[in-house]
Swiss-Prot record:
GO CC annotation, single: cytoplasm
Function, in words: Aspartyl-tRNA synthetase with relaxed tRNA specificity since it is able to aspartylate not only its cognate tRNA(Asp) but also tRNA(Asn). Reaction proceeds in two steps: L-aspartate is first activated by ATP to form Asp-AMP and then transferred to the acceptor end of tRNA(Asp/Asn).
Chain positions of site Important for tRNA non-discrimination: G84
NCBIfam families reported in the protein's UniProt record: aspS_bact, PRK00476.1
Protein name: Aspartate--tRNA(Asp/Asn) ligase
Residue stretches in coiled coil: none
Annotated gene: aspS
Entries under HAMAP family matching the protein: Asp_tRNA_synth_type1
Keywords linked to the UniProt accession: Aminoacyl-tRNA synthetase, ATP-binding, Cytoplasm, Ligase, Nucleotide-binding, Protein biosynthesis
Residues reported in the UniProt entry to bind L-aspartate: E176, R222, H450, R491
Source organism of the structure: Bacillus anthracis (strain CDC 684 / NRRL 3495)
Length: 591
Protein backbone atom coordinates (compact mmCIF):
# COMPACT_ATOMS: atom_id res chain seq x y z
CA UNK A 1 0.00 0.00 0.00
CA UNK A 2 1.47 3.34 -1.05
CA UNK A 3 2.01 6.02 1.57
CA UNK A 4 -0.45 8.89 1.78
CA UNK A 5 1.07 12.00 0.20
CA UNK A 6 -1.60 14.55 1.10
CA UNK A 7 -4.37 15.01 3.62
CA UNK A 8 -7.74 15.44 1.89
CA UNK A 9 -8.35 18.97 3.14
CA UNK A 10 -4.88 20.17 2.16
CA UNK A 11 -4.84 19.43 -1.56
CA UNK A 12 -4.74 22.93 -3.08
CA UNK A 13 -3.96 24.58 -6.43
CA UNK A 14 -0.25 24.30 -5.60
CA UNK A 15 -0.61 20.53 -6.20
CA UNK A 16 -2.10 20.86 -9.71
CA UNK A 17 -0.39 18.39 -12.04
CA UNK A 18 0.89 16.22 -9.20
CA UNK A 19 0.00 12.59 -8.60
CA UNK A 20 -1.38 12.23 -5.09
CA UNK A 21 -2.14 9.32 -2.77
CA UNK A 22 -5.22 9.98 -0.62
CA UNK A 23 -6.86 7.95 2.14
CA UNK A 24 -10.13 8.63 3.86
CA UNK A 25 -13.87 8.05 4.16
CA UNK A 26 -16.57 8.56 1.55
CA UNK A 27 -18.65 11.54 2.63
CA UNK A 28 -20.90 11.55 -0.44
CA UNK A 29 -21.16 9.74 -3.78
CA UNK A 30 -22.88 11.19 -6.86
CA UNK A 31 -23.42 9.16 -10.04
CA UNK A 32 -24.00 11.43 -13.04
CA UNK A 33 -24.27 8.62 -15.59
CA UNK A 34 -20.80 7.86 -16.86
CA UNK A 35 -19.06 10.08 -14.28
CA UNK A 36 -18.95 9.41 -10.54
CA UNK A 37 -18.01 12.10 -8.03
CA UNK A 38 -16.93 11.18 -4.52
CA UNK A 39 -16.27 13.58 -1.66
CA UNK A 40 -13.38 11.98 0.21
CA UNK A 41 -13.05 13.03 3.85
CA UNK A 42 -10.40 12.82 6.52
CA UNK A 43 -9.91 14.87 9.66
CA UNK A 44 -8.55 17.85 7.70
CA UNK A 45 -11.51 18.24 5.35
CA UNK A 46 -12.94 17.09 2.03
CA UNK A 47 -11.60 16.78 -1.51
CA UNK A 48 -13.62 15.95 -4.61
CA UNK A 49 -12.50 12.85 -6.52
CA UNK A 50 -13.73 12.28 -10.09
CA UNK A 51 -14.01 8.81 -11.64
CA UNK A 52 -13.99 9.10 -15.43
CA UNK A 53 -13.88 6.13 -17.85
CA UNK A 54 -11.48 8.09 -20.05
CA UNK A 55 -9.03 8.25 -17.14
CA UNK A 56 -9.52 4.73 -15.73
CA UNK A 57 -12.33 2.27 -16.48
CA UNK A 58 -11.09 0.01 -13.66
CA UNK A 59 -11.32 2.80 -11.10
CA UNK A 60 -14.83 3.69 -12.32
CA UNK A 61 -15.97 0.08 -11.94
CA UNK A 62 -14.80 0.04 -8.32
CA UNK A 63 -16.42 3.43 -7.70
CA UNK A 64 -19.79 2.01 -8.79
CA UNK A 65 -19.68 -0.35 -5.77
CA UNK A 66 -18.68 2.31 -3.26
CA UNK A 67 -21.10 3.72 -0.64
CA UNK A 68 -20.98 6.31 2.13
CA UNK A 69 -18.35 5.79 4.86
CA UNK A 70 -16.34 3.25 2.86
CA UNK A 71 -12.64 3.69 3.59
CA UNK A 72 -10.68 4.27 0.38
CA UNK A 73 -7.17 4.59 -0.94
CA UNK A 74 -7.23 6.80 -4.04
CA UNK A 75 -4.42 7.56 -6.47
CA UNK A 76 -4.99 10.35 -8.95
CA UNK A 77 -3.90 13.56 -10.59
CA UNK A 78 -4.79 17.00 -9.26
CA UNK A 79 -6.49 19.26 -11.81
CA UNK A 80 -8.10 22.67 -11.63
CA UNK A 81 -11.87 22.79 -11.66
CA UNK A 82 -13.71 24.50 -14.47
CA UNK A 83 -14.96 28.05 -13.84
CA UNK A 84 -18.52 26.94 -13.16
CA UNK A 85 -17.47 24.21 -10.74
CA UNK A 86 -15.36 26.29 -8.32
CA UNK A 87 -16.55 26.18 -4.70
CA UNK A 88 -14.91 28.89 -2.60
CA UNK A 89 -16.71 27.65 0.52
CA UNK A 90 -14.22 24.80 0.88
CA UNK A 91 -10.43 24.88 1.09
CA UNK A 92 -10.13 22.42 -1.81
CA UNK A 93 -12.88 24.04 -3.85
CA UNK A 94 -10.63 25.10 -6.76
CA UNK A 95 -9.31 21.62 -7.55
CA UNK A 96 -10.41 18.04 -7.97
CA UNK A 97 -8.59 14.74 -8.23
CA UNK A 98 -8.94 12.62 -11.38
CA UNK A 99 -8.76 9.07 -10.02
CA UNK A 100 -6.46 6.60 -11.74
CA UNK A 101 -6.60 3.88 -9.08
CA UNK A 102 -8.87 3.17 -6.13
CA UNK A 103 -8.96 0.40 -3.56
CA UNK A 104 -11.51 -0.22 -0.84
CA UNK A 105 -9.65 -0.51 2.47
CA UNK A 106 -12.89 -1.33 4.27
CA UNK A 107 -16.60 -1.35 3.51
CA UNK A 108 -19.26 0.14 5.78
CA UNK A 109 -22.86 -0.62 6.66
CA UNK A 110 -25.40 2.17 6.40
CA UNK A 111 -24.63 4.33 9.44
CA UNK A 112 -27.31 4.96 12.08
CA UNK A 113 -26.37 8.65 12.14
CA UNK A 114 -25.59 11.14 9.40
CA UNK A 115 -21.88 11.94 9.47
CA UNK A 116 -22.29 15.70 9.20
CA UNK A 117 -22.29 18.70 11.52
CA UNK A 118 -26.06 19.08 11.16
CA UNK A 119 -26.86 15.45 11.98
CA UNK A 120 -30.45 14.81 13.03
CA UNK A 121 -29.59 11.95 15.40
CA UNK A 122 -30.72 12.09 19.02
CA UNK A 123 -28.06 12.41 21.68
CA UNK A 124 -28.67 8.84 22.88
CA UNK A 125 -28.01 7.47 19.39
CA UNK A 126 -24.93 9.67 19.06
CA UNK A 127 -23.58 8.35 22.37
CA UNK A 128 -24.34 4.72 21.52
CA UNK A 129 -22.42 5.09 18.26
CA UNK A 130 -19.90 7.57 19.60
CA UNK A 131 -17.15 6.33 17.27
CA UNK A 132 -19.33 7.47 14.34
CA UNK A 133 -20.34 10.71 16.04
CA UNK A 134 -16.65 11.55 16.46
CA UNK A 135 -16.21 11.49 12.67
CA UNK A 136 -18.27 14.66 12.35
CA UNK A 137 -16.00 17.65 11.63
CA UNK A 138 -17.48 19.70 14.48
CA UNK A 139 -16.46 16.97 16.92
CA UNK A 140 -12.92 16.73 15.60
CA UNK A 141 -12.59 20.52 15.76
CA UNK A 142 -13.77 20.48 19.38
CA UNK A 143 -11.10 17.96 20.34
CA UNK A 144 -8.48 19.85 18.36
CA UNK A 145 -9.46 22.87 20.46
CA UNK A 146 -9.11 20.77 23.62
CA UNK A 147 -5.65 19.64 22.52
CA UNK A 148 -4.59 23.22 21.76
CA UNK A 149 -5.85 24.48 25.12
CA UNK A 150 -4.04 21.75 27.04
CA UNK A 151 -0.84 22.21 25.04
CA UNK A 152 -0.86 25.98 25.62
CA UNK A 153 -1.39 25.52 29.36
CA UNK A 154 1.41 22.96 29.59
CA UNK A 155 3.79 25.21 27.67
CA UNK A 156 2.93 28.23 29.81
CA UNK A 157 3.35 26.40 33.11
CA UNK A 158 6.63 24.93 31.88
CA UNK A 159 7.99 28.45 31.28
CA UNK A 160 6.87 29.32 34.84
CA UNK A 161 8.93 26.36 36.14
CA UNK A 162 6.02 24.19 37.25
CA UNK A 163 6.49 20.41 37.44
CA UNK A 164 3.82 18.06 36.12
CA UNK A 165 3.34 15.40 38.80
CA UNK A 166 0.81 12.56 38.85
CA UNK A 167 -1.07 11.86 42.07
CA UNK A 168 -2.85 8.62 43.07
CA UNK A 169 -6.13 7.50 41.54
CA UNK A 170 -6.73 4.93 44.30
CA UNK A 171 -6.91 6.99 47.47
CA UNK A 172 -8.76 7.45 50.77
CA UNK A 173 -12.44 8.24 51.12
CA UNK A 174 -13.18 11.51 52.94
CA UNK A 175 -16.53 12.67 54.30
CA UNK A 176 -16.58 16.20 52.85
CA UNK A 177 -17.87 17.13 49.40
CA UNK A 178 -19.80 14.92 46.99
CA UNK A 179 -20.15 11.16 47.29
CA UNK A 180 -17.05 9.15 46.47
CA UNK A 181 -16.78 6.36 43.93
CA UNK A 182 -15.58 3.43 46.04
CA UNK A 183 -13.27 0.61 44.94
CA UNK A 184 -13.19 -2.52 47.14
CA UNK A 185 -9.79 -3.90 48.08
CA UNK A 186 -9.20 -7.61 47.43
CA UNK A 187 -6.11 -7.66 49.65
CA UNK A 188 -7.55 -5.69 52.57
CA UNK A 189 -10.80 -7.46 53.29
CA UNK A 190 -13.75 -5.14 53.94
CA UNK A 191 -11.81 -1.99 53.11
CA UNK A 192 -12.19 0.40 50.21
CA UNK A 193 -10.26 2.89 48.15
CA UNK A 194 -11.98 5.98 46.75
CA UNK A 195 -11.44 7.57 43.36
CA UNK A 196 -10.25 11.16 43.90
CA UNK A 197 -12.73 14.03 43.75
CA UNK A 198 -9.65 16.19 43.31
CA UNK A 199 -5.92 15.87 44.06
CA UNK A 200 -6.34 18.49 46.83
CA UNK A 201 -4.49 16.83 49.69
CA UNK A 202 -1.75 15.32 47.55
CA UNK A 203 -0.93 18.63 45.89
CA UNK A 204 -0.69 20.26 49.32
CA UNK A 205 1.62 17.46 50.44
CA UNK A 206 3.78 18.13 47.37
CA UNK A 207 4.16 21.67 48.71
CA UNK A 208 5.18 20.19 52.08
CA UNK A 209 7.63 18.11 50.05
CA UNK A 210 9.31 21.24 48.72
CA UNK A 211 8.25 21.00 45.06
CA UNK A 212 7.04 24.63 45.21
CA UNK A 213 5.30 24.59 41.82
CA UNK A 214 3.10 21.69 40.69
CA UNK A 215 0.45 21.09 38.07
CA UNK A 216 -1.45 18.14 36.69
CA UNK A 217 -4.06 17.51 34.02
CA UNK A 218 -6.03 15.55 36.57
CA UNK A 219 -8.86 13.07 36.21
CA UNK A 220 -11.43 13.53 38.97
CA UNK A 221 -14.52 11.55 39.99
CA UNK A 222 -17.69 12.59 41.81
CA UNK A 223 -20.77 10.47 42.38
CA UNK A 224 -23.30 13.29 42.26
CA UNK A 225 -26.54 14.19 40.54
CA UNK A 226 -25.75 15.27 37.01
CA UNK A 227 -26.83 18.13 34.76
CA UNK A 228 -25.76 19.53 31.40
CA UNK A 229 -22.47 20.90 32.72
CA UNK A 230 -21.51 18.00 35.04
CA UNK A 231 -20.03 14.55 34.47
CA UNK A 232 -19.15 11.78 36.96
CA UNK A 233 -15.57 11.82 35.66
CA UNK A 234 -14.01 15.03 34.49
CA UNK A 235 -10.65 16.70 33.92
CA UNK A 236 -9.26 19.68 35.74
CA UNK A 237 -6.09 21.69 35.34
CA UNK A 238 -4.79 21.41 38.88
CA UNK A 239 -2.22 23.99 40.00
CA UNK A 240 -0.48 24.64 43.32
CA UNK A 241 2.41 26.90 44.30
CA UNK A 242 4.32 27.83 47.45
CA UNK A 243 5.30 31.31 48.63
CA UNK A 244 2.89 33.18 46.31
CA UNK A 245 0.35 35.76 47.43
CA UNK A 246 -3.23 35.71 46.18
CA UNK A 247 -2.47 38.61 43.85
CA UNK A 248 0.51 36.73 42.39
CA UNK A 249 -1.61 33.63 41.74
CA UNK A 250 -4.37 35.65 40.08
CA UNK A 251 -1.87 37.54 37.95
CA UNK A 252 -0.26 34.30 36.78
CA UNK A 253 -3.63 32.76 35.90
CA UNK A 254 -4.58 35.88 33.95
CA UNK A 255 -1.39 35.63 31.91
CA UNK A 256 -2.10 31.95 31.31
CA UNK A 257 -5.71 32.49 30.25
CA UNK A 258 -4.90 35.39 27.92
CA UNK A 259 -2.37 33.12 26.23
CA UNK A 260 -4.90 30.28 25.98
CA UNK A 261 -7.46 32.63 24.43
CA UNK A 262 -4.95 33.93 21.90
CA UNK A 263 -3.25 30.66 20.96
CA UNK A 264 -6.24 28.29 21.04
CA UNK A 265 -9.10 30.62 20.13
CA UNK A 266 -7.41 33.50 18.31
CA UNK A 267 -9.09 36.03 20.60
CA UNK A 268 -7.34 38.85 22.45
CA UNK A 269 -8.60 39.44 25.99
CA UNK A 270 -7.21 42.13 28.23
CA UNK A 271 -5.83 41.68 31.72
CA UNK A 272 -6.07 42.25 34.60
CA UNK A 273 -9.53 40.70 34.81
CA UNK A 274 -12.16 42.59 36.82
CA UNK A 275 -12.56 41.51 40.44
CA UNK A 276 -15.79 41.44 42.41
CA UNK A 277 -16.38 40.43 46.01
CA UNK A 278 -18.78 37.54 46.56
CA UNK A 279 -21.20 39.74 48.50
CA UNK A 280 -21.30 42.29 45.67
CA UNK A 281 -21.87 39.59 43.04
CA UNK A 282 -24.81 38.20 44.97
CA UNK A 283 -26.24 41.66 45.64
CA UNK A 284 -25.92 42.94 42.07
CA UNK A 285 -26.50 39.78 40.02
CA UNK A 286 -28.06 37.21 42.35
CA UNK A 287 -25.25 34.85 41.38
CA UNK A 288 -21.75 33.91 42.51
CA UNK A 289 -20.83 33.49 38.84
CA UNK A 290 -22.38 36.52 37.12
CA UNK A 291 -22.56 36.88 33.36
CA UNK A 292 -21.26 40.42 32.88
CA UNK A 293 -21.82 40.54 29.13
CA UNK A 294 -25.03 42.48 29.74
CA UNK A 295 -26.39 44.92 32.33
CA UNK A 296 -29.78 44.44 34.06
CA UNK A 297 -28.56 44.34 37.65
CA UNK A 298 -30.76 43.61 40.65
CA UNK A 299 -31.92 46.62 42.69
CA UNK A 300 -32.58 46.31 46.43
CA UNK A 301 -35.91 47.92 47.32
CA UNK A 302 -36.13 46.63 50.89
CA UNK A 303 -35.89 50.07 52.50
CA UNK A 304 -38.62 51.41 50.22
CA UNK A 305 -40.71 48.24 50.64
CA UNK A 306 -40.71 48.47 54.43
CA UNK A 307 -42.84 51.61 54.30
CA UNK A 308 -44.88 51.12 51.14
CA UNK A 309 -48.54 50.18 50.93
CA UNK A 310 -48.09 46.72 49.45
CA UNK A 311 -48.37 44.15 52.24
CA UNK A 312 -46.51 41.40 50.34
CA UNK A 313 -43.45 43.67 50.25
CA UNK A 314 -43.69 44.94 53.82
CA UNK A 315 -44.22 41.49 55.36
CA UNK A 316 -41.22 40.08 53.49
CA UNK A 317 -38.97 42.77 54.97
CA UNK A 318 -40.50 42.46 58.45
CA UNK A 319 -39.75 38.72 58.48
CA UNK A 320 -36.07 39.32 57.71
CA UNK A 321 -36.29 38.90 53.96
CA UNK A 322 -35.87 41.45 51.21
CA UNK A 323 -37.45 42.86 48.07
CA UNK A 324 -35.45 43.20 44.88
CA UNK A 325 -36.35 44.11 41.33
CA UNK A 326 -35.13 43.90 37.75
CA UNK A 327 -35.82 46.59 35.18
CA UNK A 328 -36.13 44.97 31.75
CA UNK A 329 -35.60 48.10 29.66
CA UNK A 330 -38.06 48.48 26.79
CA UNK A 331 -39.54 45.03 27.39
CA UNK A 332 -43.09 45.98 28.42
CA UNK A 333 -44.51 45.52 24.93
CA UNK A 334 -42.61 42.26 24.42
CA UNK A 335 -44.21 40.40 27.33
CA UNK A 336 -47.93 39.66 27.43
CA UNK A 337 -49.78 38.62 30.57
CA UNK A 338 -49.35 35.01 29.45
CA UNK A 339 -45.60 35.53 28.99
CA UNK A 340 -45.31 37.00 32.47
CA UNK A 341 -47.26 34.05 33.89
CA UNK A 342 -44.57 31.82 32.36
CA UNK A 343 -41.88 33.92 34.07
CA UNK A 344 -43.79 33.54 37.34
CA UNK A 345 -43.77 29.75 37.03
CA UNK A 346 -40.07 29.96 36.20
CA UNK A 347 -39.11 31.79 39.42
CA UNK A 348 -41.20 29.37 41.48
CA UNK A 349 -38.73 26.64 40.48
CA UNK A 350 -36.16 28.61 42.49
CA UNK A 351 -38.36 28.83 45.58
CA UNK A 352 -40.09 32.17 44.96
CA UNK A 353 -43.75 32.34 45.96
CA UNK A 354 -44.54 34.59 43.02
CA UNK A 355 -43.41 37.37 40.71
CA UNK A 356 -44.85 40.87 41.05
CA UNK A 357 -44.71 43.11 37.99
CA UNK A 358 -45.41 46.56 36.66
CA UNK A 359 -45.29 48.09 33.21
CA UNK A 360 -44.16 51.70 32.92
CA UNK A 361 -46.34 53.82 30.65
CA UNK A 362 -46.34 57.53 29.87
CA UNK A 363 -49.22 58.15 32.29
CA UNK A 364 -47.89 55.99 35.14
CA UNK A 365 -47.50 52.41 36.32
CA UNK A 366 -49.79 49.65 35.08
CA UNK A 367 -50.23 46.15 36.42
CA UNK A 368 -51.91 44.08 39.14
CA UNK A 369 -50.02 45.77 41.98
CA UNK A 370 -50.08 49.35 40.64
CA UNK A 371 -53.07 50.21 42.87
CA UNK A 372 -50.92 49.72 45.98
CA UNK A 373 -48.56 52.58 45.11
CA UNK A 374 -49.55 56.20 45.39
CA UNK A 375 -48.07 58.92 43.24
CA UNK A 376 -45.12 59.48 45.58
CA UNK A 377 -44.29 55.77 45.89
CA UNK A 378 -44.59 55.33 42.14
CA UNK A 379 -42.16 58.19 41.63
CA UNK A 380 -39.68 56.66 44.09
CA UNK A 381 -39.94 53.30 42.33
CA UNK A 382 -39.32 54.79 38.90
CA UNK A 383 -36.39 56.88 40.11
CA UNK A 384 -34.78 54.02 42.04
CA UNK A 385 -35.10 51.63 39.10
CA UNK A 386 -34.26 54.34 36.53
CA UNK A 387 -37.48 53.38 34.78
CA UNK A 388 -38.94 55.09 31.75
CA UNK A 389 -41.96 54.44 29.56
CA UNK A 390 -41.83 51.00 27.95
CA UNK A 391 -39.92 49.29 30.77
CA UNK A 392 -41.03 46.09 32.51
CA UNK A 393 -40.38 45.95 36.27
CA UNK A 394 -40.20 42.53 37.93
CA UNK A 395 -40.12 42.02 41.71
CA UNK A 396 -39.47 39.15 44.11
CA UNK A 397 -40.11 39.46 47.86
CA UNK A 398 -38.83 36.54 49.91
CA UNK A 399 -35.89 35.19 51.90
CA UNK A 400 -32.58 36.65 50.75
CA UNK A 401 -31.37 33.35 49.30
CA UNK A 402 -34.62 32.85 47.36
CA UNK A 403 -34.56 36.42 46.03
CA UNK A 404 -30.99 35.96 44.80
CA UNK A 405 -31.58 32.53 43.22
CA UNK A 406 -34.85 33.42 41.50
CA UNK A 407 -33.94 36.89 40.21
CA UNK A 408 -30.44 35.75 39.27
CA UNK A 409 -31.93 32.99 37.10
CA UNK A 410 -34.64 35.32 35.75
CA UNK A 411 -31.99 37.85 34.75
CA UNK A 412 -30.20 35.23 32.64
CA UNK A 413 -33.45 34.12 31.03
CA UNK A 414 -34.40 37.69 30.14
CA UNK A 415 -30.90 38.34 28.81
CA UNK A 416 -31.30 35.46 26.36
CA UNK A 417 -34.93 36.16 25.42
CA UNK A 418 -34.30 39.86 24.83
CA UNK A 419 -31.06 39.09 22.97
CA UNK A 420 -29.01 41.31 25.25
CA UNK A 421 -25.98 38.98 25.34
CA UNK A 422 -23.13 39.61 22.93
CA UNK A 423 -22.14 36.03 22.11
CA UNK A 424 -18.83 37.20 20.64
CA UNK A 425 -17.63 38.47 24.03
CA UNK A 426 -15.46 36.57 26.49
CA UNK A 427 -15.88 38.29 29.86
CA UNK A 428 -13.57 36.96 32.56
CA UNK A 429 -14.19 37.87 36.19
CA UNK A 430 -12.65 37.01 39.55
CA UNK A 431 -15.11 36.52 42.42
CA UNK A 432 -13.20 36.96 45.68
CA UNK A 433 -13.71 37.18 49.45
CA UNK A 434 -16.05 34.22 49.77
CA UNK A 435 -17.70 33.11 52.99
CA UNK A 436 -15.53 30.42 54.54
CA UNK A 437 -18.48 28.35 55.78
CA UNK A 438 -22.13 27.85 54.90
CA UNK A 439 -24.76 26.72 57.41
CA UNK A 440 -27.09 23.89 56.42
CA UNK A 441 -30.31 24.08 58.42
CA UNK A 442 -31.36 20.52 57.56
CA UNK A 443 -28.04 19.04 58.69
CA UNK A 444 -27.74 21.59 61.53
CA UNK A 445 -24.05 22.14 60.87
CA UNK A 446 -21.57 24.17 58.88
CA UNK A 447 -20.09 23.05 55.58
CA UNK A 448 -17.02 24.47 53.84
CA UNK A 449 -18.05 26.83 51.03
CA UNK A 450 -15.09 25.56 48.98
CA UNK A 451 -13.30 22.85 50.98
CA UNK A 452 -12.00 22.38 54.55
CA UNK A 453 -8.44 23.38 53.65
CA UNK A 454 -9.18 26.97 52.62
CA UNK A 455 -7.33 29.65 54.58
CA UNK A 456 -9.52 32.21 56.35
CA UNK A 457 -8.44 35.83 56.47
CA UNK A 458 -5.92 36.11 59.29
CA UNK A 459 -8.13 38.50 61.23
CA UNK A 460 -11.03 36.03 60.92
CA UNK A 461 -9.31 32.91 62.31
CA UNK A 462 -10.69 33.49 65.80
CA UNK A 463 -14.21 33.76 64.36
CA UNK A 464 -14.04 30.02 63.69
CA UNK A 465 -14.67 29.54 67.41
CA UNK A 466 -17.01 32.47 68.07
CA UNK A 467 -18.96 33.32 64.89
CA UNK A 468 -18.06 30.88 62.08
CA UNK A 469 -20.66 32.30 59.70
CA UNK A 470 -18.78 35.63 59.64
CA UNK A 471 -15.39 34.18 58.68
CA UNK A 472 -14.18 35.10 55.20
CA UNK A 473 -12.13 32.83 52.97
CA UNK A 474 -9.02 33.77 51.03
CA UNK A 475 -10.73 32.11 48.07
CA UNK A 476 -11.32 33.11 44.48
CA UNK A 477 -13.35 31.75 41.58
CA UNK A 478 -12.63 32.42 37.92
CA UNK A 479 -15.85 33.09 35.98
CA UNK A 480 -16.27 33.24 32.21
CA UNK A 481 -19.57 34.39 30.67
CA UNK A 482 -21.59 33.24 33.67
CA UNK A 483 -19.86 29.86 34.07
CA UNK A 484 -17.53 28.95 36.90
CA UNK A 485 -14.29 27.93 35.19
CA UNK A 486 -12.59 27.02 38.41
CA UNK A 487 -11.89 27.91 41.97
CA UNK A 488 -8.91 28.26 44.22
CA UNK A 489 -7.66 29.65 47.49
CA UNK A 490 -4.73 30.12 49.76
CA UNK A 491 -4.50 27.01 51.93
CA UNK A 492 -4.28 26.42 55.63
CA UNK A 493 -0.70 25.39 56.40
CA UNK A 494 -0.64 25.45 60.23
CA UNK A 495 -1.95 22.59 62.35
CA UNK A 496 -3.74 24.74 64.92
CA UNK A 497 -5.69 26.65 62.26
CA UNK A 498 -6.62 23.41 60.47
CA UNK A 499 -7.84 21.91 63.73
CA UNK A 500 -10.01 24.98 64.37
CA UNK A 501 -11.46 24.58 60.88
CA UNK A 502 -12.26 20.90 61.48
CA UNK A 503 -13.88 21.77 64.81
CA UNK A 504 -16.05 24.44 63.17
CA UNK A 505 -17.16 21.80 60.66
CA UNK A 506 -18.28 19.52 63.48
CA UNK A 507 -15.36 17.09 63.52
CA UNK A 508 -14.31 15.66 66.85
CA UNK A 509 -10.56 15.48 67.50
CA UNK A 510 -10.75 11.72 66.97
CA UNK A 511 -12.60 12.08 63.65
CA UNK A 512 -10.17 14.70 62.39
CA UNK A 513 -7.22 12.51 63.34
CA UNK A 514 -8.74 9.41 61.74
CA UNK A 515 -9.59 11.14 58.47
CA UNK A 516 -6.76 13.66 58.12
CA UNK A 517 -4.11 12.72 60.65
CA UNK A 518 -1.46 12.39 57.93
CA UNK A 519 -2.09 15.99 56.83
CA UNK A 520 -2.11 17.39 60.37
CA UNK A 521 1.21 15.68 61.09
CA UNK A 522 2.68 17.00 57.84
CA UNK A 523 1.88 20.54 58.99
CA UNK A 524 4.31 20.02 61.90
CA UNK A 525 7.33 19.66 59.62
CA UNK A 526 7.75 23.14 58.21
CA UNK A 527 4.92 23.51 55.71
CA UNK A 528 5.31 26.60 53.48
CA UNK A 529 2.47 29.05 52.80
CA UNK A 530 0.83 27.87 49.60
CA UNK A 531 -2.22 28.18 47.40
CA UNK A 532 -3.56 27.22 44.04
CA UNK A 533 -6.48 26.76 41.72
CA UNK A 534 -8.27 24.06 39.74
CA UNK A 535 -9.75 24.92 36.35
CA UNK A 536 -12.36 22.74 34.65
CA UNK A 537 -10.84 21.75 31.31
CA UNK A 538 -14.07 20.26 29.95
CA UNK A 539 -16.05 23.41 30.70
CA UNK A 540 -13.35 25.74 29.36
CA UNK A 541 -13.29 23.84 26.06
CA UNK A 542 -17.11 23.83 25.94
CA UNK A 543 -17.16 27.62 26.13
CA UNK A 544 -14.32 28.22 23.68
CA UNK A 545 -15.69 25.73 21.15
CA UNK A 546 -19.18 27.21 21.38
CA UNK A 547 -20.75 23.98 22.61
CA UNK A 548 -23.69 23.87 25.01
CA UNK A 549 -23.06 20.49 26.59
CA UNK A 550 -20.02 19.14 28.43
CA UNK A 551 -20.57 15.76 26.80
CA UNK A 552 -19.49 17.26 23.47
CA UNK A 553 -16.02 17.97 24.90
CA UNK A 554 -15.39 14.48 26.33
CA UNK A 555 -14.51 11.70 23.91
CA UNK A 556 -16.56 8.99 25.61
CA UNK A 557 -18.90 10.67 28.11
CA UNK A 558 -21.63 9.37 30.39
CA UNK A 559 -25.33 10.17 30.18
CA UNK A 560 -27.29 12.15 32.76
CA UNK A 561 -27.78 8.86 34.63
CA UNK A 562 -24.00 8.24 34.66
CA UNK A 563 -24.16 5.35 32.20
CA UNK A 564 -22.17 4.72 29.03
CA UNK A 565 -24.48 3.84 26.15
CA UNK A 566 -21.52 2.64 24.07
CA UNK A 567 -20.07 0.05 26.46
CA UNK A 568 -23.21 -0.37 28.59
CA UNK A 569 -21.30 0.47 31.77
CA UNK A 570 -22.03 0.14 34.62
CA UNK A 571 -22.85 -3.54 34.28
CA UNK A 572 -23.18 -6.62 36.50
CA UNK A 573 -20.03 -8.57 37.31
CA UNK A 574 -19.53 -12.30 37.70
CA UNK A 575 -20.38 -13.89 41.04
CA UNK A 576 -16.79 -15.16 41.22
CA UNK A 577 -15.48 -11.59 41.15
CA UNK A 578 -17.73 -10.63 44.05
CA UNK A 579 -16.68 -13.69 46.04
CA UNK A 580 -13.02 -12.82 45.51
CA UNK A 581 -13.75 -9.43 47.05
CA UNK A 582 -15.90 -10.95 49.82
CA UNK A 583 -18.85 -8.83 48.69
CA UNK A 584 -22.55 -9.67 48.65
CA UNK A 585 -25.16 -7.67 46.79
CA UNK A 586 -28.25 -6.36 48.55
CA UNK A 587 -30.14 -4.88 45.62
CA UNK A 588 -33.55 -3.44 46.48
CA UNK A 589 -36.31 -4.65 44.22
CA UNK A 590 -38.30 -1.97 42.44
CA UNK A 591 -41.93 -1.90 43.56
Amino acid sequence: MAERTHACGKVTVEAVGQTVQLKGWVQKRRDLGGLIFIDLRDRTGIVQVVFNPETSKEALEVAETIRSEYVLHVEGTVVERGEGAINDNMATGRIEVQATKVSVLNAAKTTPIIIADDTDASEDVRLKYRYLDLRRPVMFNTFKMRHDVTKTIRNFLDTEEFLEVETPILTKSTPEGARDYLVPSRVHDGEFYALPQSPQLFKQLLMVGGFERYYQVARCFRDEDLRADRQPEFTQIDIEASFLTQDEILDMMERMMTKVMKDAKGVEVSAPFPRMKYADAMARYGSDKPDTRFEMELTDLSEFAAGCGFKVFTSAVESGGQVKAINAKGAASKYSRKDIDALTEFVKVYGAKGLAWLKVEEDGLKGPIAKFFGEEDASVLKNTLEATAGDLLLFVADKKSVVADSLGALRLRLGKELELIDESKFNFLWVTDWPLLEYDEDADRYFAAHHPFTMPFREDVELLETAPEKARAQAYDLVLNGYELGGGSLRIYERDVQEKMFKALGFSQEEAQEQFGFLLEAFEYGTPPHGGIALGLDRLVMLLAGRTNLRDTIAFPKTASASCLLTEAPSPVAEAQLEELNLKLNVKEEK
